[in-house]
Every structure is written in C-alpha cells, then in structure tokens.
Design a protein with these regions (language model features):
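Nucleic-acid endonuclease domains
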Residues: 1-104, 109-268
Length: 268
C-alpha cells in the first residue's frame, strides 16, 4: 500500500521518491481559519514584532495570517504603548494578553470580518447556570432553559447596569488592541480604557422593534423553534445607534451571549 502511494505521488506531482516519502511522513498543515486560529496567530504576530517569547504551539499558528497581521502592525507599534510590551501572558487564559511596562495591561481582540462584534471577557457568553449564579438567580432559575424569558426580563429592567458590566469586562485592561477584517485585509484599532465609568447612566436605550419581548419563532422549514436574539440601540431618531446584540443559545451550549458592535466601541 505504501509503495503504491509513493508511486502515485511521484507520478502525479513529479517529485523524487525521497520527497514523496517526506510528504507522507509530514503532511502539510491544514488550518481551519477559525476565530481561535486567527486569535492565536495574531498573538504570535505581536510577539514576533516585539521580539518576546510566544507560548503558543507552532501547529496552532497560521503563518500566513501572522505575517499578514505583522505587516499592518509593524508601522503602528512605534506610535503607541505597544512598544512597552514586556511579556505575553495570554496562555493563562485570563483577561490579560500582554503585560506592559509600568504595570499596564493589554487585551488583544480579533475579528474575521470588518463588521464583527466583540464579546466581553468573563461575562459575555456564560452558560445558563453561570449566568444565574453571577446575577443571583440560581436558586430560582437553576440554569434551566425554560426560564430564558425571565432572564431577558431582568436584562431589560436593568439594562444600563447590565451594559456597564459588559463594558467593564470588555475594557478589563488599560488598552484594547482590536484587529478587524483578519480574514482579508486586517486593520489596527487601538482603544484606551474609558476614563469615566459608568458610561451608561441615563441614555435612551431600546431593543429592536418586534424583539422587545422574548419569544422563540417557529421555523416551518426546519420544524423547530428558533433561538431568540435582539439588538439594543442607544439614542433616538437619526441619532439612534447600535450598541450590541443579545443571543440566547439553546443548542449543545446553552448560554446567554452579548457582544458589542465594533462601531459602538470605536466611536462611543
């Protein structure tokens, strides 16, 4: 069997037997281009530019993505506190990705597309059980799926506070390095932690029309109920802007997810 494979490779690809044997022993890596791969490749890119140790395994890095990101980051680093990076600590799976001089911290976020959304650390996509525990409802709701309408009612009644918690956990570091459109042509957005908190105090906030109440729409084609989602807005009339999106997942991972729209974080 092995001989037939070697012969097929040499005949098809016009390579030597030695090259064919090497290809069998070490097939080329195939990258999934997932959000995780992009994020780890971006972290590797920052480490490469700053000449610091990277703890990410080589087989988890997409070299093409890393080099593409290095290309847009290199002319940027001399103008920002990025040049003060001392070490990469993202491998700890905490809120901080890089430690800077003077005790400052940096978080790295990547988006596959330019119109992506950013999920807060720690509280952005908890399971139903974790959500209930965090917001003090576990004794009442017990992490059960059928109580999603109660969870959404709580969010609506405490929306300003809820969004402030989400915002605090998005800017849990002194700086946020945001790299959108990594799937094609990445760009660089360097955001500083807001000087004034809480941000959401008395703004007019609203949900997408027709999505103000929790409901699961029946999908006739799929013969099942759809997951509920709704967008939250700030302002009125022409000043109305998207803030973020809530999603209630009920599949293999049952969770309450919230993500900020990129344009809100970069402009608010």
């Amino acid at each position: 069997m092995r001989e037939r494979v070697i012969k097929a490779i040499t005949n098809t690809l016009k390579v030597t037997r030695e090259e064919a044997e090497t290809m069998i022993k070490k097939p080329p890596r195939v990258y999934s281009n997932s959000n995780e791969t992009i994020g780890q490749s971006a972290e590797h890119a920052v480490c490469s530019i700053m000449n610091i140790h990277c703890s990410i395994a080589e087989d988890r890095i997409d070299d093409a993505i890393s080099k593409k990101i290095q290309g847009v980051l290199t002319p940027f680093v001399d103008k920002t506190p990025l040049c003060d990076i001392e070490s990469s600590i993202g491998f700890r799976n905490g809120a901080v990705d890089f430690q800077l001089k003077g005790g400052k911290t940096l978080s790295l976020k990547t988006l596959k597309r330019s119109d992506g959304k950013i999920c807060p650390q720690n509280v952005g996509q908890p399971t139903l059980k974790k959500w209930d525990e965090h917001w003090g409802f576990y004794q009442e709701l017990e992490g059960k799926l059928e109580h999603n309408s109660k969870r959404f009612d709580y969010i609506k009644s405490n929306l300003h506070h809820y969004l402030n918690v989400m915002l605090d956990n998005t800017f849990c570091c002194d700086y946020l390095l945001l790299l959108p459109n990594c799937d094609k042509t990445p760009s660089v957005e360097f955001l500083k932690k807001p000087p004034i908190t809480p941000f959401f105090v008395d703004q007019t906030l609203s949900f997408k029309e027709g999505r103000e109440t929790y409901f699961e729409r029946w999908d006739e084609k799929k013969q099942k109920y759809c997951e509920f989602s709704s967008t939250v807005y700030m302002g009125q009339g022409e000043e109305k802007k998207r803030v973020g999106e809530f999603q209630f997942h009920k599949g293999s991972r049952k969770e309450v997810k919230f993500r900020f729209y990129r344009e809100f974080l970069t402009n608010y």
